[in-house]
Amino acid sequence: MYDINKVREDFPILSRTVYGKPLVYFDNGATTQKPLCVLDAMREEYLNVNANVHRGVHWMSQQATDLHEAARETVRKFINARSTTEIVFTRGTTE
C-alpha cells in the first residue's frame, strides 16, 4: 500500500494549500503535475542538452536523441512492453 503523504512529498506543488486545505489536483486530462525527479530531469535537459530530437546532425541533437531513446527504454521496462516501438510519446492524453 502506498503512503499517500510520501507520494505527495514527491510533488512540490501539492505542498500548497487552497482555502486552508491541502491542494488536490484532478484535471489530469489537461495536464499532470510532475514529481520533483521529473522537474529536475527537465531542468537538466533544458540547461545542458536542449536540442531537436531525431532532426539534427550536430552533437547536442545527438545527445538529446540518445536521452529521448533512453527514456523510451525506461518506459518500456516500466510497463513491460515487448519493444520500444510500442512506446509513443505525445503532447497530451487527448492527442
Predicted features and spans:
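Pyridoxal 5′-phosphate
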Residues: 1-95
